[in-house]
């Protein structure tokens, strides 16, 4: 039962390593020959395993799963068994020896640093758990099985066939700590590496900084929007433009020249004095006065200007007061448009025209 628990624990540890598939080693079959300790098993030592009869040397069979911890250090979980005869006991007497081992090995790469060499000698140290089962052997009160702790020490070599396959040979000594004797095993197997052997990280090479190629700034095309307003106020029953508003009309003409696709919507308004028909004509006349000034004095294309009269329908002040009526006798124009300008490197784009 104890051996089974150790085997299960070993498998649980090894499974994630195999799943990682990087530097994982598998030895699916280890074959060898185990030489049993003759002094311990020939009846010459009190309390030996067989109580007299001698365990015979026999075939060693095993398998191992491991991982390369560094390019020169590895760990393996191993299971093996030996089944042989027992001389001096009843006819057909035999024993079966089982082991679960955890072994570390250090290759010659620790010293040589020759990670691509085809032959890699190694030394091995480890420990494990053993169990002997006996059939046809009279062991008195000791029963038909024996188990305990062991230690392993060995030397060997990996003979690389390619980066994934190596032949493996090893000579190993196993010490039975409970019974105080040594067994010796010569073994060989085929070692498979999943994901390739570990190698030291490549040295960091400092790369000289690359000076960026100077970038010559290029001219940029930008769109400038025009949003402008014009307000002109009139005397009662008049549609002529007072001199004080002519500079404002000139500014509108200038912007219409700067923005060739700009248009103006010109709206005329009146107070509520007089009949409606008269105020409708008067409000339109006031809008047309501003349009005529732009067309006749500044050569603005008439198709870019639209006019409309609203009479007293859209007052902005109280028509009951003199001041309010003066505010309502007006023209209100909105000028909108856009243009594409080319801005040279280092030149700031002009701010959009603000509403006036």
Curated annotation (Swiss-Prot):
One of its GO terms (cellular component) is cell outer membrane. PROSITE patterns: OMPA_2. SUPFAM superfamilies: OMPA-like, OmpA-like. Its main location: membrane. It is a multi-pass membrane protein. Keywords: Apoptosis, Cell outer membrane, Ion transport, Membrane, Porin, Signal, Transmembrane, Transmembrane beta strand, Transport. It comes from the Bacteria. Gene3D superfamilies: 2.40.160.20, OmpA-like domain. One of its GO terms (molecular function) is porin activity. InterPro entries: Bact_OuterMem_StrucFunc, OMP/PagP_b-brl, Omp38, OMP_b-brl, OMP_bac, OmpA-like, OmpA-like_sf. Homotrimer. Belongs to the outer membrane OOP (TC 1.B.6) superfamily. This is Outer membrane protein Omp38. It comes from Acinetobacter baumannii (strain ATCC 17978 / DSM 105126 / CIP 53.77 / LMG 1025 / NCDC KC755 / 5377). The gene is omp38.
